[in-house]
UniProtKB/Swiss-Prot annotation:
InterPro entries: AceK_kinase (IPR046855), AceK_regulatory (IPR046854), Isocitrate_DH_AceK (IPR010452)
Sequence similarity: Belongs to the AceK family.
Native organism: Burkholderia ambifaria (strain MC40-6)
Pfam families found in the cross-reference section: AceK_kinase (PF06315), AceK_regulatory (PF20423)
Protein encoded by which gene: aceK
GO MF annotations, alphabetized: [isocitrate dehydrogenase (NADP+)] kinase activity; AMP binding; ATP binding; phosphoprotein phosphatase activity; protein serine/threonine kinase activity
Protein's name in the database: Isocitrate dehydrogenase kinase/phosphatase
Subcellular location: Cytoplasm
Function according to Swiss-Prot or TrEMBL: Bifunctional enzyme which can phosphorylate or dephosphorylate isocitrate dehydrogenase (IDH) on a specific serine residue. This is a regulatory mechanism which enables bacteria to bypass the Krebs cycle via the glyoxylate shunt in response to the source of carbon. When bacteria are grown on glucose, IDH is fully active and unphosphorylated, but when grown on acetate or ethanol, the activity of IDH declines drastically concomitant with its phosphorylation.
Length: 608
């Protein structure tokens, strides 16, 4: 039944809708300005500035929402607006969006504002956008001076090499390239190596998104090659190789490699998008099967991704019948974790009380999750979606799960109209817990898992992250085989830690003691003590010592800390370093190491 008013008679309704849209437009203008600033910082190789910009942008959305709420409260007494006017506000807002270029994001902003003003009983499609109202299909900025979402290039006219060079130079990056002709030759060789020689069909063309994607120390060109009925995705990372000189680092030509650089374990890109839905639609064509929610999140529109994810969850619940269950694996001391087997995510709730030896609070744990959200995750820490007042049908909850919820988190539960409302939770991609992966794995899988675990911790270390609890159960294996950290309640900055060696025992009594014979401060870490917790399985021990024997040496950890304190930002690559042109085609390069090779090739970091 449609409860909407037949006439839009409320001037307040129109004024409130217009005020909300003006506030959204301000938010999106700031969002785009950040992407423009990212290009300038990248050209200057100001990596600390880029990090700072990315952190500030994450909190910008919530700041704009709060500003809008305060304006509506002060000027319109929003909490006391009656229901009919609120319905008119939504209809006026829809009318204002008919020619808007970010309507889906504006609808999400409307929801965010309303959720801070209205009671959750109003969270239905009469008052907020449970479903989208404005279509984004074929949406494009048709103003004469506007950049198109993507540009089409036709190699049949000028040849592939000239076309590729024009694609790169059209981005008008300020530093010159060290040797663009060499790099274009590497791209063409990589295409031949991957696909062999292929005949150009009449429709042979290359589509390239008009804006660069900035993250860490790279700027990515993203596009697709179309030839006959084939659509071939590609991404080309551009990096500084010497002060004031750029180079194409590689070309990624496989869908799985693109899915990794756009994965949930990486920080968000900075990319200037006039019509974000058009960018997302394009990315969906080169990464089919990747949820739109994840793509919106990866390009920095995490609130839109969060909104789409929740719609996906509701849609899945209406088309499935299995029950939420307690997640398999070792139960945590701090979080209660459950999952829906048919849905590839886990739901995590902070418990009301924590048994010893945990000494923390709900507020401290929430701050740890915010730390991870703001930090560069490097492909080694899972992103989380944070929700309030999530209503799940009681009929879909396993009885054992309900009992566990009532036991561990009673303060966060409300029963309402056949639903269990959870006041606060986090949602993450479901992964195979590393302890189960190693426990059940073949010899090859164990070697892969252990090698990945060591790489993950070492990369986190160089990014100033100390995981705290390094047990295998706190890491997961993604569908791409990457090991990712996902338990954040003990996480610390490495620079806040005091790396120590275990002092020698003073006497035989110390040596035989089951307790430390030395004082341990709250931020002291002793890498050499991790062995008993990580090397109990002989198969694990053998491969661990083969690949990561230095893991237990305090000098490794201290060296990373020292570099961080000196302001160094290491190089990380979201692809295997063997794909880098300088490694793959060394004969095309001179022997002088580039600026991205501060570490030896063997130490070069991967963060997939």
């Amino acid at each position: 039944m449609n409860h909407f008013p037949k006439l839009l008679s409320s001037q307040i309704g129109f004024d409130v809708a217009q005020t909300m849209l003006e506030n959204f437009d301000r938010h999106y203008r700031i969002f785009r300005e950040a992407a423009v600033d990212a290009k300038t910082l990248y050209e200057r190789a100001d990596w600390h500035g880029l990090q700072r910009l990315a952190r500030e942008r994450i909190t910008s959305y919530d700041d704009r929402v709060q500003e809008c709420v305060e304006v509506l409260q002060d000027e319109y007494d929003a909490e006391n607006i009656d229901d009919e006017v609120w319905q008119q506000i939504k209809l006026h807002y829809i009318g204002l969006l008919t020619s808007h270029r970010q309507p889906e994001c504006a609808e999400t902003f409307f929801n965010s504002v309303c959720c801070k003003i209205l009671h959750r009983s109003y969270f239905n499609n009469d008052f907020i956008f449970v479903r989208p109202a404005i279509s984004t299909e074929y949406l494009e900025n048709d103003e004469p001076a506007a950049k198109p979402t993507y540009r089409a290039y036709y190699p049949g006219t000028d040849g592939l090499a000239a076309t590729l060079e024009r694609i790169v130079t059209n981005f008008q990056l300020e530093p010159p390239f060290e040797d663009l002709t060499r790099d274009i030759g590497c791209v063409m060789q990589a295409i031949t190596d991957e696909f062999g020689e292929f005949d150009a069909a009449p429709n042979f063309q290359i589509h390239v998104l008009s804006s660069l994607f900035f993250r860490n120390k790279s700027a990515y060109i993203v596009g697709r090659i179309i030839n006959a009925d084939r659509v071939l995705p590609f991404a080309v990372p551009i990096r500084h190789v010497r002060p004031g000189l750029l180079a194409l680092d590689t070309v990624l030509l496989r869908r799985d490699l693109l899915q990794i650089i756009f994965s949930f374990s990486h920080s968000y890109f900075l990319v200037d998008m006039g019509v974000p839905s058009a960018y997302v639609d394009f990315l969906c064509t080169i990464m089919p099967g990747k949820p739109k929610a994840e793509i919106y999140t990866s390009v920095g529109l995490q609130k839109q991704g969060k909104n789409l994810f929740y719609r996906d969850l509701l849609h899945h619940l209406s088309h499935s019948s299995d029950r939420f269950i307690i997640a398999p694996g070792i139960k945590g001391l701090v979080m209660l974790v459950f999952t829906l087997p048919s849905f590839p995510y886990v739901f995590k709730i902070i418990k009301d009380h924590f048994p010893p030896p945990k000494e923390t609070t709900r507020e401290q744990i929430m701050e740890k999750y915010q730390l991870v959200k703001r930090h560069d995750r490097l492909g080694r820490m899972a992103d989380t979606l944070e929700y309030s007042s999530v209503a799940l049908p009681i009929s879909r909850l396993d009885h054992a799960l309900v009992r566990e919820l009532e036991k561990e988190v009673p303060s966060l539960l409300e029963y309402e109209d056949g639903n269990l409302v959870i006041k606060h939770l986090y949602i993450e991609r479901r992964m195979i817990p590393l302890n189960l992966y190693l426990q059940n794995g073949t010899d090859a899988e164990i070697e892969h898992g252990v090698k990945e675990y060591g790489n993950a911790v070492k990369e986190l270390m160089k990014a100033n992250i100390f995981p705290g609890d390094m047990l295998y159960k706190n890491f997961g294996v993604t569908r791409h085989g990457r090991v990712v950290f996902y338990d954040y309640d003990e996480i610390e900055y490495l620079t806040d830690c005091n790396v120590r060696r275990v002092p020698p025992p003073r006497n035989e009594e110390d040596e035989l003691s089951g307790e430390p014979w030395y004082t341990v401060g709250p931020h002291d870490i002793f890498p050499e003590t991790y062995g008993p917790f990580l090397l109990g399985d002989p198969r694990v021990r053998a491969v661990f010592m083969k690949h990561h024997a230095d893991f237990f040496e305090a000098s490794l950890w201290q060296a990373s800390k020292d570099k961080l304190l000196q302001g160094e930002l290491p190089d990380f690559y979201p692809y295997d370093v063997s794909l880098r042109f300088s490694v793959r085609y060394p004969d095309r390069f001179d022997s002088t190491p580039d600026a991205g090779d501060g570490d030896s090739a063997g130490d070069a970091q991967r963060a997939a």
